A protein has these predicted regions:
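Short alpha-helical segments and helix-capping/turn motifs at coil-helix boundaries
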Residues: 104-105, 117, 121, 180-186, ...
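Bacterial Sec-dependent N-terminal signal peptides
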Residues: 1-20
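Glycine- and hydrophobic-rich flexible loops that cap the catalytic core of alpha/beta enzyme folds
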Residues: 220-221, 228-231, 240-244, 249-388
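Hydrophobic alpha-helical segments
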Residues: 354-464, 537
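Proteins synthesized as precursors that undergo proteolytic processing into mature forms
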Residues: 331-357, 364, 437-492
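Substrate-recognition/specificity elements adjacent to catalytic centers across diverse enzyme folds
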Residues: 20-223, 227-236, 322
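Acidic, low-complexity N-terminal propeptides/linkers enriched in Ser/Thr/Asp/Gly that mediate export
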Residues: 107-200, 205-207, 364-368, 376, ...
């Protein structure tokens, strides 16, 4: 990638105290506004990253830290209550205090540099501070926030919300969730036919908020030279490339969180293997606003040997996820930033601190690699871990984890390619080199499905023996759906078998979709019709049988809903995708 460097400013600030000397930090922004940050030490570059990111989006960083430290509702009232409760429910502060000694001194210096950068920015820009009690930000506050993010990434919050709502298993909303997804592709010289390896980093994150990407380039005299992206509040790059290698992530969905129903003897005593245990009562404190006044509210939860615990009308339930068992994920990412070879990179994966995420990798030595990574518990196979499991026996109380070597992975395949699109790790390269699902415990519950994107990716990657860089870019920017459609959660293909003459009141809409070339281009009328139709499916999804097949009659109902929506909002049944789906930033679209 070619950069045109335009020096907008050089940062020189002076502070009396602290580990970092700001005179050793230089921030140069290129023509896109991306900060290129130079420092003598990694702590220097972390300081510069914090300052640059704060210049661009200090509000989001603060809101993230407020939520992670359980005080967001002090600033925004009831909107922050949910995040504050979960942050206190998982007791991150206690976890960080207990495990802080497991961090290296080198990484603690990075954390100190980053938090010094935020504190210095706040000191020089007091009008931008949302809540003064958040400051000074410390390395521990940073880590406490990261614990919340990782718990959310393991979908632990869904179980908490379900239990509070007097359910146990969270509702799945695949129609809505399928609009989110990421893709990774890595090609070695076996596939490129040249002395080159290609890596596509195509993660899809929100444009705003605590999980929106922030691009940066970090350089230090301690061996760091990496460009990539990070989340607000993180002190290092989370996906990117250095001079030697690059990696990216997509979200994976093995079983990363469990719910246990406790056997209660009375309101405060539960029984495990015939032995009585006492629930430890805890209280989360949040705030709401009433006529401008900040009113404290509280919610009781408990601690059991299974983890943080809640009571609802159905019983007492504990939520347990590996993300809360260590605080080393950020240091693992930081070490990955500095890796110079596949063996070194893999050795950091063996820390087993990241609770999840697929990883796609390529390096200058022509090694490509894929792994469905995660801290996956070793569970008793006699239980169905997709459901609530009994919390009355230590047979279900897992405390050990599969090693990195025991996870589904592909290293340097003969096919010359690996890929993932939030689908099964058992379809990650050529068919004869895929991981064998029979070699992995069913209780790990790895995905076994393909989806539209993975189906299309495989078709494109396997259609030619070698792929040029132009081919690679064409695949990366491909907007086509496969034939037949391959949604992993529903079969909608009956729409292409419907005779428009049999449905005259929606014939125009049906023909637009049936004549569509499956390319989701902004100017496509077929794509526009299909997109509107797609968003009508959600309310009917839970009416489907186990096969999850939309029959013609139900599709007809959805088509009528789509037509009604189009006429109401667009005054026509024929619109382009770009009329319905737009990227809007301020006054630009």
């Amino acid at each position: 990638m070619r950069y045109l460097f335009v020096v907008l400013f050089t940062l020189v600030l002076r502070i009396v105290h602290g580990q970092v000397n700001p005179e050793d930090v230089e921030i140069i922004r290129d023509s896109y506004g991306v900060p290129h940050i130079y420092g003598k030490t990694d702590a220097d570059t972390a300081y510069g990253l914090a300052w640059a990111h704060a210049e661009d989006d200090f509000v989001t960083i603060q809101k993230a830290y407020l939520a992670g430290n359980g005080i967001l509702s002090r600033w925004n009232g009831k909107q922050g209550v949910g995040a504050d409760f979960i942050a206190q429910f998982i007791q991150s502060e206690h976890t960080v205090d207990r495990l802080y000694h497991t961090l290296s001194n080198e990484f603690i210096a990075v954390l100190q540099g980053y938090t010094e950068g935020l504190n210095s920015y706040a000191k020089h820009n007091p009008d931008e501070v949302l809540l003064s009690s958040l400051f000074p930000i410390t390395p521990k506050k940073l880590l406490i926030y990261s614990q919340l993010q990782l718990f959310l990434s393991n979908e632990g919050d869904r179980f908490v919300e379900a239990i509070i709502s007097d359910r146990v298993v969270p509702y799945k909303k695949p129609i809505e969730e399928d609009v989110r997804g990421s893709n990774l592709i890595a090609l070695s010289s076996r596939k490129t036919g040249t002395n080159e390896s290609f890596l596509a980093i195509n993660t899809h994150q929100p444009l705003e908020g605590p999980t929106s990407w922030y691009e940066a380039h970090l350089v230090s005299e301690e061996g760091t030279n990496i460009i990539g992206a990070t989340f607000p509040g993180a002190p290092c790059i989370l996906t990117g490339a250095n001079e030697y290698l690059g990696w990216t992530h997509t979200v994976n969905y093995p079983d990363k969180a469990d719910v246990f129903q406790l056997e209660m003897k009375n309101k405060t005593t539960y029984i495990v293997d015939g032995e009585a245990h006492q629930l430890v009562k805890k209280k989360a404190k949040m705030y709401v606003r009433f006529f401008g006044m900040r009113i404290p509210v509280s919610k009781v939860f408990y601690e059991s040997i299974y983890g943080p615990t809640l009571r609802n009308k159905a019983g007492v339930f504990a939520v347990r996820t590996p993300s809360t068992t260590n605080i080393n994920a950020l240091e693992q990412w930081w070490r990955m930033n500095k890796a110079r070879s596949f063996s070194e990179f893999y050795s950091y994966l063996e820390w087993n601190a990241l609770p999840g995420y697929n990883i796609g990798y390529a390096d200058r030595n022509d090694t490509i690699f894929y792994i469905s990574n995660g801290k996956i518990p070793k569970r008793d196979s006699s239980y169905d871990w997709r459901k609530v499991v009994p919390g009355d026996t230590k047979k279900t109380l897992w405390n050990s984890y599969y090693t990195t070597q025991e996870l589904p992975q592909v290293i340097a395949p003969k096919s010359g390619y690996v890929y993932n699109a939030n689908h099964s790790p058992f379809f990650s390269t050529a068919p004869d080199e895929n991981p064998n699902p029979d070699e992995f415990a069913k209780a790990m519950n790895f995905e076994t499905y393909n989806n539209n994107r993975s189906t299309r990716l495989f078709d494109l990657l396997s259609e030619k023996d070698t792929l040029t860089y132009e081919d690679f870019k064409r695949i990366k920017y491909d907007h086509s759906l496969p034939t037949p459609l391959n949604y992993n959660y529903v079969d909608f293909n009956a729409i292409f078998e419907m005779n428009p003459d049999d449905y005259p009141d929606v014939a125009d809409l049906l023909m637009d979709i049936q004549n569509w070339d499956r390319v989701a281009s902004a100017d496509s009328y077929g794509a526009g019709a299909f997109a509107v139709l797609y968003y009508t499916l959600g309310k009917y999804y839970f009416k489907l049988g186990p096969s999850k097949v939309f029959n013609k009659l139900l599709i007809y109902t959805c088509l009528k809903d789509a037509k009604k929506h189009l006429l109401k909002h667009f005054k026509t049944t024929s619109i382009r995708l770009g009329d319905f789906q737009k990227l809007v930033r301020g006054e630009k679209e």
